[in-house]
Each structure stands twice: as structure tokens, then as C-alpha cells.
Amino acid sequence: MGAGASAEEKHSRELEKKLKEDADKDARTVKLLLLGAGESGKSTIVKQMKIIHQDGYSVEECLEFIAIIYGNTLQSMIAIVKAMNTLNIQFGDPARQDDARKLMHLADTIDEGSMPKEMSDIIGRLWKDTGIQACFDRASEYQLNDSAGYYLNDLDRLVIPGYVPTEQDVLRSRVKTTGIIETQFGLKDLNFRMFDVGGQRSERKKWIHCFEGVTCIIFIAALSAYDMVLVEDDEVNRMHESLHLFNSICNHRYFATTSIVLFLNKKDVFTEKIKKAHLSICFPDYDGPNTYEDAGNYIKTQFLELNMRRDVKEIYSHMTCATDTENVKFVFDAVTDIIIKENLKDCGLF
């Protein structure tokens, strides 16, 4: 009888210990939801978490991105060539018209994600054409990946035999996120579970079941989207869509007590773009200087003023460049400190 009781007590103690360990783990688990409109840079932030907190990409993993990189490069050139027609731009050299036809034919016949020499030669010749460059300069008037210039300028390196993508090549690669992707990592004695949710309109209905128990939302908006339209609706300005989405999330009853951090992303692209395209394209009331600081601060204010609970809920904002590992590391460190501070406040310790 005594032996049975002590076995029960032992089991009970073990169970209590396990429950306490689970409770401690739950208390240290941070559930992060990455939200934002399509192509704002959410998936790039996830890749950075792998680089910063999970030992990065192995050579084998980098090699798996070759097909995506080649696919992105080809699709970018096809998009530019098609836009030449739409925007009525002529090739600098009439011989490139024939290259453009060959490119379209080859694209239909090659294996997806491959880059035969004939194709890379054609893409290289097209990229040097003055008409193609003029069309590239008007990229906000059609849909073109942000990485287009990066890959096309580096095409010779990408097609060298034995090519292994660099971390920067991997970060710049683009695959539309469908569904929900979870990444786990540890930092400052916390267990992070980060959820990247597809941003395009058709994906948003999948968000709802991620809402419960979220510690922090990182909302990502592309600063450079101010003169662009949506992939899924060419009547809607991307910045307006992002503001509309942020409004619905930041004032949602689900998130009344959730920390919200705003990443105003693609500051590198924005820096170059703001020199050429005035912010009044997106915000007709804006008559301030068309500089990175002034225009950037104006955009930030448009987001922060949507917060209807400003008196009790602070929204933290950062200008970010998701492809810059040091910048993301610095900003994410600050976000982690915010999460720790908010958690201590909830426990009455701050």
C-alpha cells in the first residue's frame, strides 16, 4: 500500500514539475504575427531570422534557391519587355526586338527555373539596351519585382558554372507566400514563434485563427509603395491599401492589448524613388519637401494617426531595410526589448 502511495506521490510531483516547466515555457513564449499587404517584405524578415538566429543558410539550402533566382530574373525581363509595348517605348537597337521575341519563345520551352546560355546571353543584351533601361526607370507603372535590377546587374555572376547563391541573393529572391509559415528561434531567454501570413487579398482570410494569444504584431508596410498599384487590383494604390489594412488591424478588438510594431520597410528603394517621384502622387495634400526625412515622416504619421487608442496604446515604429541584415538585427533587438518591457508591465514589474 505504502509503495503504491509513494509511487503516486512521485508521479504527482513529476506532473506538477512538468506543469510548472510548461507554464514557465509558455510565459517565455512570444507569439509574433507578421502582417502587411503583399510584397511588403514579410518573408524577407523571416529569412533574416534564419540568418541571425538559426545559423543562416547552408550551401545546400542556398543551392535550392537557384531555380527561384533564375525564375525571378527571367520573369523580371519578361515584365520589362511586355511593358515596353504597353508604355510605347522603342528599343535603342532595333535588333533587340528580335531578342525579345526569342526570349518569349525560349521562356515557353525551357524547364522552369533553368537558365541556358542562349537565354542568359539574350537577357544580357536586352538589359544593356537604352530602351529597356528607360522602361526599367518607369517600373512603378507596371508590376516588377524589387530585385529585378539587383539580379539583372549581376547576371554574369549568376550564370557562372558552379554558382552558389549568396545570402543576399537568397534574401532578394521572391516567392509569393501562400498560407502561413512558422519560424521558431530563441533570443534573450525567450522562445519566439513567428508567423508569416500571405499578404495578398486572397490570403487574408487565413489569418483569423492565428489571432489568439498573440504577444506582438509586426506590421510591415513598404515605404516605396506610394506610387504603385496592387497586383490584384490595378485601381488601388499600394500605400492606401496598406493604410486601410493597418487601420483594421490596429483598431481591432482582438488586438486591444497586443503590442504593435510598425516596420516602414524598403527604405533603400524609397531613398532613390523619392528623388524622382513626388509623394503627392499618393497624398495630394502633401506639400512638404520631397526628401527622405520629410516624406518618410509624413508617411509614418499617416499610419500612427490611425491608432484610435493613442492615449493608452503606443505603436512603435522603425524605418527598415529587410535585405540589410545588420539593420534587421538592430531593429529586432529593439522589438525584443519592447516585448520584454510590455510583458513586465503586464506582470506589474515595470
Swiss-Prot record:
<feature type="domain" description="G-alpha">
    <location>
        <begin position="28"/>
        <end position="350"/>
    </location>
</feature>
<feature type="binding site">
    <location>
        <position position="322"/>
    </location>
    <ligand>
        <name>GTP</name>
    </ligand>
</feature>
<keyword id="KW-0460">Magnesium</keyword>
<comment type="similarity">
    <text>Belongs to the G-alpha family. G(i/o/t/z) subfamily.</text>
</comment>
<keyword id="KW-0479">Metal-binding</keyword>
<dbReference type="GO" id="GO:0016020">
    <property type="term" value="C:membrane"/>
</dbReference>
<feature type="compositionally biased region" description="Basic and acidic residues">
    <location>
        <begin position="7"/>
        <end position="21"/>
    </location>
</feature>
<feature type="region of interest" description="G4 motif">
    <location>
        <begin position="261"/>
        <end position="268"/>
    </location>
</feature>
<dbReference type="Pfam" id="PF00503">
    <property type="entry name" value="G-alpha"/>
</dbReference>
<feature type="binding site">
    <location>
        <begin position="196"/>
        <end position="200"/>
    </location>
    <ligand>
        <name>GTP</name>
    </ligand>
</feature>
<dbReference type="GO" id="GO:0009416">
    <property type="term" value="P:response to light stimulus"/>
</dbReference>
<dbReference type="GO" id="GO:0050908">
    <property type="term" value="P:detection of light stimulus involved in visual perception"/>
</dbReference>
<feature type="binding site">
    <location>
        <position position="177"/>
    </location>
    <ligand>
        <name>Mg(2+)</name>
    </ligand>
</feature>
<feature type="region of interest" description="G1 motif">
    <location>
        <begin position="31"/>
        <end position="44"/>
    </location>
</feature>
<dbReference type="InterPro" id="IPR027417">
    <property type="entry name" value="P-loop_NTPase"/>
</dbReference>
<keyword id="KW-0547">Nucleotide-binding</keyword>
<keyword id="KW-0807">Transducer</keyword>
<dbReference type="InterPro" id="IPR001019">
    <property type="entry name" value="Gprotein_alpha_su"/>
</dbReference>
<keyword id="KW-0844">Vision</keyword>
<feature type="binding site">
    <location>
        <begin position="36"/>
        <end position="43"/>
    </location>
    <ligand>
        <name>GTP</name>
    </ligand>
</feature>
<dbReference type="GO" id="GO:0005737">
    <property type="term" value="C:cytoplasm"/>
</dbReference>
<feature type="lipid moiety-binding region" description="N-myristoyl glycine">
    <location>
        <position position="2"/>
    </location>
</feature>
<keyword id="KW-0519">Myristate</keyword>
<feature type="binding site">
    <location>
        <begin position="171"/>
        <end position="177"/>
    </location>
    <ligand>
        <name>GTP</name>
    </ligand>
</feature>
<feature type="region of interest" description="G2 motif">
    <location>
        <begin position="169"/>
        <end position="177"/>
    </location>
</feature>
<feature type="region of interest" description="Disordered">
    <location>
        <begin position="1"/>
        <end position="21"/>
    </location>
</feature>
<comment type="function">
    <text>Guanine nucleotide-binding proteins (G proteins) are involved as modulators or transducers in various transmembrane signaling systems. Transducin is an amplifier and one of the transducers of a visual impulse that performs the coupling between rhodopsin and cGMP-phosphodiesterase.</text>
</comment>
<feature type="region of interest" description="G3 motif">
    <location>
        <begin position="192"/>
        <end position="201"/>
    </location>
</feature>
<dbReference type="GO" id="GO:0007188">
    <property type="term" value="P:adenylate cyclase-modulating G protein-coupled receptor signaling pathway"/>
</dbReference>
<keyword id="KW-0449">Lipoprotein</keyword>
<dbReference type="InterPro" id="IPR011025">
    <property type="entry name" value="GproteinA_insert"/>
</dbReference>
<dbReference type="GO" id="GO:0005834">
    <property type="term" value="C:heterotrimeric G-protein complex"/>
</dbReference>
<dbReference type="GO" id="GO:0031683">
    <property type="term" value="F:G-protein beta/gamma-subunit complex binding"/>
</dbReference>
<comment type="subunit">
    <text>G proteins are composed of 3 units; alpha, beta and gamma. The alpha chain contains the guanine nucleotide binding site.</text>
</comment>
<feature type="binding site">
    <location>
        <position position="43"/>
    </location>
    <ligand>
        <name>Mg(2+)</name>
    </ligand>
</feature>
<feature type="region of interest" description="G5 motif">
    <location>
        <begin position="320"/>
        <end position="325"/>
    </location>
</feature>
<dbReference type="GO" id="GO:0007603">
    <property type="term" value="P:phototransduction, visible light"/>
</dbReference>
<feature type="binding site">
    <location>
        <begin position="265"/>
        <end position="268"/>
    </location>
    <ligand>
        <name>GTP</name>
    </ligand>
</feature>
<dbReference type="GO" id="GO:0046872">
    <property type="term" value="F:metal ion binding"/>
</dbReference>
<keyword id="KW-0716">Sensory transduction</keyword>
<keyword id="KW-0342">GTP-binding</keyword>
<dbReference type="GO" id="GO:0003924">
    <property type="term" value="F:GTPase activity"/>
</dbReference>
